[in-house]
């Protein structure tokens, strides 16, 4: 087994040959390389598949052997300082290796067809292969300096891929926004690394964990300084995993191609922050203040992400806020010390979210011939609807991914989310209430996405499908030349002027002869004639969806407890995942539930599933075919008092959707406080520099020049000037003599 571990360093390097080959090909023989560009997908997939097989072999050995292997190379700079580089293979590493390689392979296969007509096909495969290499290097790193090196490479690749279509100004601004926002977290991470190096004189994980086990409990070092450095490390994870308040880059990152959105949200960039916290949890767990702060940030993020997803119209941005919320669940689990539940949800969410993003890409691909290739139209759920008849395979896979994320058994995310909910209730009722309520919201907004996309009838002719620029805050423009002047505070997803109501209680009566001319947002009463219809994507794009569907159906089984005997009338818990994670859990002696009561499990499961079903039901009432049915019968108006004033419930509903659609006004706040504030400070500094500093210096120079000119004039050899000053001096002398 040790012989196999010795070659684990090859895994991150396997995708590099194809990257270098494509680079040399584009440089030396560009015409031939571009003409044969589809061939380059095969070696990219092949090499990553070899890495996956190697990773799977290591994982099997981890499960059977339960050991940790670390290999180091030491580079001595001088007698007092040396750098150590190496790789670490433990359960966390093996989990991430399988996650990255499996999702990465499926994304590469999907991209071969999705990007086939794009001029940047080769450039895309170079970027995405290097992205996989960077993430594989990150998870195998044995110390903080290596993690930071690959951390920056991951950020660079995300910058390149988010701005892949850099000729579009909005995409160029989006990658800049992601880069600048992550700079805040990366700066904190670097300061935290330097701080711990100053404390311990080492960057190795074993030395940091020694602090956690020995020095901190015995007050061997300054706990305040250690807490500050740990907070700075956590700041890096906050930015990379899109946690509040550094989450604003994530929805705008959807400007990149859809396959890279799947990779970023499933297995690479946003997973890097969770991985960093999981790797350093033995250190954080000895700092109760930091653990409380982590759980608080996770709780805020999971609730905020769910509320911001409620009213989004862009299918990819809705899924992006869903990712933000689910990452909040993982952060909460790590904050309360539930290491196994956090990693379990990381695994299940990765496959479910990859399925959803690739499914959304299939939907976008099928809509583009109808509405055009502008993301404002092809990704707008308002113009979709009724796609279940045209893309049945995509619809089935998307529905399974949706139900998984909603927490419906026996799909993957049910098992992991239920474990997080149970542990959060045990840790704090406050966290349990927020997490459980958000689980219901998750079911609501996820089923909303499904219904608006696949239910009802096709709405390609729907008018007023997007709000005006003056009416809403487009945060992506904050990083460009223009800045939105206002915020739409009264926006609700409705079209009042056209007589079509989305959430209005006062629904106008629609004459029979006009029902075929007006389309409801949720489900139109009739579809206009069109000669072009959406079509199912090719087999190359459907194959990854079907494989991810299998993962979504069965990956949850690794966390299902099996009977391992009875002790004190309780069934001892044994899962594949717990056996897999045994060495890592032993590092910090996680006080997890070593046993499980079947009654407690059923109680928790019934409550969580009930919340999910309730959310699904409410979403169907508002967005499904039932809404159109009630609207035609004028059913809702019979339940509401008819008065000219809007009801209180309608106002609350309006404010909630205005909050959600405008991203909680957080981007607006950042614009006013930070961006415009920094610009005004820069203008004030420029004025002070030019007006005051330069004014004083120029004034001194001018005064010296004038004095010199006067002296030159006086000493110019004129007798009259000499007599004048002589008389002046004599007069002053006589004046002061008493």
From Swiss-Prot:
Pfam families hit by this protein: Proton_antipo_C, Proton_antipo_M, Proton_antipo_N
Coiled coil regions, renumbered to chain: none
Cellular compartments annotated: Plastid, Chloroplast thylakoid membrane
EC number annotated for this UniProt entry: 7.1.1.-
GO cellular component terms given for this protein: chloroplast thylakoid membrane
Oligomeric and partner information: NDH is composed of at least 16 different subunits, 5 of which are encoded in the nucleus.
Function according to Swiss-Prot or TrEMBL: NDH shuttles electrons from NAD(P)H:plastoquinone, via FMN and iron-sulfur (Fe-S) centers, to quinones in the photosynthetic chain and possibly in a chloroplast respiratory chain. The immediate electron acceptor for the enzyme in this species is believed to be plastoquinone. Couples the redox reaction to proton translocation, and thus conserves the redox energy in a proton gradient.
UniProt-recorded name of the protein: NAD(P)H-quinone oxidoreductase subunit 5, chloroplastic
């Amino acid at each position: 087994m040790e012989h196999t571990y010795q070659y684990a360093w090859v895994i991150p390097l396997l995708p590099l040959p194809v990257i270098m080959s494509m680079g040399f090909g584009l440089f030396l023989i560009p015409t031939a390389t571009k003409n044969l560009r589809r061939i380059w997908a095969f070696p990219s997939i092949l090499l990553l598949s070899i890495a996956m097989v190697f990773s799977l072999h290591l994982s099997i050995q981890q499960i059977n052997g339960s050991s940790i292997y670390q290999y180091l190379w030491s580079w001595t700079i001088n007698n007092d300082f040396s750098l150590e580089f190496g790789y670490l293979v433990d359960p966390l590493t093996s989990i991430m290796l399988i996650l990255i390689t499996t999702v990465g392979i499926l994304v590469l296969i999907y991209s071969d067809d999705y990007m086939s007509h794009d001029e940047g096909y080769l450039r895309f495969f170079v970027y995405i292969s290097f992205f996989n290499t960077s993430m594989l290097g990150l998870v195998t790193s044995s110390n903080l300096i290596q993690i930071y090196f690959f951390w920056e490479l991951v950020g660079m690749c995300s910058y390149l891929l988010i701005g892949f279509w850099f000729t579009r100004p909005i995409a160029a601004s989006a990658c800049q926004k992601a880069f600048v926002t992550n700079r805040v977290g990366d700066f904190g991470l670097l300061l935290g690394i330097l701080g711990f190096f100053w404390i311990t004189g080492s960057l190795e994980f074993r030395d940091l964990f020694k602090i956690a086990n020995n020095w901190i409990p015995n007050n061997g070092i300054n706990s305040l300084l250690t807490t500050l450095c740990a907070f700075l490390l956590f700041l890096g994870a906050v930015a990379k995993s899109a946690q509040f308040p550094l989450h604003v880059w994530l929805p705008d990152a959807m400007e990149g191609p859809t396959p890279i959105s799947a990779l970023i949200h499933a297995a690479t960039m946003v997973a890097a922050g969770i991985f960093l916290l999981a790797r350093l949890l033995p250190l954080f767990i000895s700092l109760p203040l930091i653990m409380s702060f982590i759980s608080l940030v996770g709780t805020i993020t999971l609730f905020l992400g769910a509320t911001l997803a409620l009213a989004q119209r862009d299918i990819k941005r809705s899924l992006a806020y869903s990712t933000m919320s689910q990452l909040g669940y993982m952060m909460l689990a790590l904050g309360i010390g539930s290491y196994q539940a956090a990693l379990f949800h990381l695994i299940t969410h990765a496959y479910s979210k990859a399925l959803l993003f690739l499914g959304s890409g299939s939907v976008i691909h099928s809509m583009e011939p109808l509405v055009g290739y502008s993301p404002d139209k092809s990704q707008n759920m308002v113009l979709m609807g009724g796609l279940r008849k045209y893309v049945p395979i995509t619809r089935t896979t998307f529905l399974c991914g949706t139900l998984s994320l909603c927490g419906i058994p026996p799909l993957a995310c049910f098992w992991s989310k239920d474990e997080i909910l149970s542990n959060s209730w045990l840790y704090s009722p406050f966290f349990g209430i927020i997490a459980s309520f958000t689980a219901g919201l998750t079911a609501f907004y996820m089923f909303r996405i499904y219904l608006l996309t696949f239910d009802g009838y096709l709405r390609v002719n729907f008018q007023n499908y997007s709000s005006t620029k003056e009416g809403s805050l487009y945060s992506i423009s904050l990083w460009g030349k223009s800045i939105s002047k206002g915020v739409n505070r009264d926006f609700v997803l409705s079209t009042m002027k056209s007589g079509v109501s989305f959430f209005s209680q006062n629904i106008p009566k629609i004459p029979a002869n006009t029902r075929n001319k007006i389309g409801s947002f949720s489900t139109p009463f009739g579809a206009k004639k069109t000669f072009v219809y959406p079509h199912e994507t090719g087999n190359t794009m459907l194959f990854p969806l079907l494989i991810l569907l299998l993962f979504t159906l069965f990956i949850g089984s690794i966390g299902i407890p099996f009977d391992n005997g009875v002790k004190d009338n309780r069934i001892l818990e044994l899962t594949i995942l717990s056996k897999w994670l045994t060495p890592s859990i032993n590092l910090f002696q996680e006080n997890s539930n070593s046993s499980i009561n079947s009654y407690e499990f059923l109680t928790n499961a019934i409550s969580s599933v009930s919340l999910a079903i309730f959310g699904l039901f409410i979403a169907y009432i508002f967005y499904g075919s039932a809404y159109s049915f009630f609207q035609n019968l004028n059913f809702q108006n019979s339940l509401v008092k008819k008065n000219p004033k809007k009801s209180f419930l309608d106002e609350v509903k309006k404010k909630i959707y205005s909050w959600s659609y405008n991203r909680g006004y957080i981007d607006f706040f950042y614009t006013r406080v930070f961006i415009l504030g920094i610009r005004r400070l820069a203008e004030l500094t420029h004025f002070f520099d030019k007006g005051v500093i330069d004014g004083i210096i120029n004034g001194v120079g001018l005064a010296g020049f004038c004095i010199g000119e006067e002296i030159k004039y006086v000493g110019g050899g004129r007798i009259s000037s000499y007599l004048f000053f002589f008389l002046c001096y004599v007069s002053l002398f006589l004046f002061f003599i008493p």
